[in-house]
Regions:
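Short, compositionally biased P/S/T/A/G/V-rich stretches that sit at domain boundaries
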Residues: 8-12, 103-145, 164
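Residue-level recognition of secondary-structure-to-loop junctions
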Residues: 17, 225, 232-239
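Contiguous beta-strand segments within globular domains
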Residues: 20-26, 142-164
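Short amphipathic, basic-aromatic surface patches that mediate peripheral association
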Residues: 31-36, 157-170
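Low-complexity "stalk/linker" and mucin-like segments enriched in Ser/Thr/Pro/Ala/Gly
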Residues: 57-58, 171-175, 179-231
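Short acidic/polar inter-strand loop motif in beta-rich domains
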Residues: 88-95, 251-257
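C-terminal edge beta-strand
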Residues: 258-274
């Protein structure tokens, strides 16, 4: 969709004091429209200082997207603001600073949550190295991709959370949610379930009050059972160009993990070159 409608609101989620002395600023956004909005990199979507611009999203799904990417700065720049600017069509330009200092905004999910939840680890392909983090790694898809032809994208994931096995809630590993979405690119990306994806059925009868709270998997979503596994999705790109696919891996079925808790999930981004 063109950059029109209600403005995209950039959000600074918080700051992270990394063990190596660097500081990371976590950013998300709010799209108050009912449809996705695309804002290309440039004068309507940029980060200052300019050296940090380029890896922010250009595709904004409807609703609230929390902790989508980070900007990491060296210790020597920890006290300098990093600004994300967004302008939606004719709307007023909005900006938000990544800023270190306020303890209320410090994100400390390097430590386990009260019930043991931690960020899952995620890697590319079936055997790629797994890492945790809000912008854990950026990789290149090494296959040939043509516009209009489906391609399988694969990630491998593991939940390293250490939970109390005597607690009946944690007898079995918590399922992980894996969510593929367009991050950057000139055209549309259509996702479909891979044949390996198991689609959970609503376990409740229609008369049960819990029935309406069950959510079916969206086409870009996969549920991984057992604490470790592979997630595949089928993606079709509408036109040639350079794309990025964002994958969010979460363990939100745990009682101490959610977007509202600012923990626990990992983001990885895969670059895909699409030819005619």
């Amino acid at each position: 969709a063109p950059p029109t409608g209600l403005p995209i609101i950039p959000v600074m989620e918080g700051w992270i004091a990394n063990p190596d002395g660097t500081t990371s600023f976590s950013f998300g956004f709010i799209n108050r429209n009912d449809v996705p909005v695309d804002i290309p990199l440039g004068t309507a979507n940029y980060i200052e200082p300019a050296k940090y611009s380029g890896m922010q999203p250009t595709h904004f799904p409807a609703g609230r997207s929390t902790g989508v990417f980070t900007v990491t700065v060296p210790a020597s720049e920890a006290d300098n603001d990093v600004w994300w600017h967004i302008k939606t069509g004719a709307e007023e330009a909005l900006k938000v600073p990544g800023r270190r200092g306020a303890s209320a905004y410090e994100l400390d999910f390097i430590l386990p949550r009260p019930q043991g939840a931690m960020q899952p680890h995620a890697g590319f392909g079936e055997n790629g190295a797994r890492l945790p983090g809000l912008f854990a790694q950026v990789g290149e898809f090494d296959g040939n991709v043509r516009a209009g032809e489906p391609v399988v994208l694969t990630v491998n994931v593991e939940d390293i959370s250490e939970r109390d096995s005597t607690d009946p809630r944690f007898v079995e590993p918590i399922p992980m949610g894996v969510h593929f979405s367009k991050y950057q690119g000139p055209g549309e990306v259509m996702f479909e379930h891979h044949e390996s994806t198991v689609i959970p059925e609503n376990p409740y009868e229609e008369g049960d009050r819990r029935f309406r709270f069950f959510r079916q998997l969206e086409p870009g979503d996969v549920q991984v059972e057992g604490g470790r596994g592979i997630a595949n999705v089928v993606a079709t790109f509408s036109q040639p160009g350079e794309y990025m696919i964002h994958t969010k891996v979460e363990n939100f079925r745990a009682p101490d993990s959610s977007d509202g808790d600012q923990c626990c999930w990992t983001n990885i981004v895969q670059k895909v070159t699409v030819t005619q």
